[in-house]
Amino acid sequence: MKRLKKRQIGRVVCTILQQLAITTPVHVVYSWGITNKTATQINVSMNGRKRFIAALMMEVYGFNYCGKLYITLNSVKQTFGLYTEKNGMLHEENSDIPFEELGKFLDTIIETGGRSQQEHYQRLQEFLHRR
């Protein structure tokens, strides 16, 4: 299996960060509680073959999800992939996130868990009243 060069990884991660900055309001990104961002490569299975792909790893501390997220880029299909790490294993959440939906999809995973804005607000209120 061929590992990627640092320059390749850097280009992909730069594209991911640029797209995130363009499509996602700053206050939304700040709400994710990102403590670490790292350009890396992950070993995934594609079409039955294992290979390394470049990824942006972010440690997030959101309301719905806390842990490591890995965002990948498929430049051929012009989509992003999202992997979460649980117990040291990578789990694919979605491999076909459209470019313009990246921020919204990440916010759903990290903060709202797919709930409507009203449901999310109610859950936040319940959480705050328990404290």
Language-model features, listed with the residues they occupy:
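Intrinsic disorder/low-structure terminal segments
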Residues: 29-33, 51, 62, 79, ...
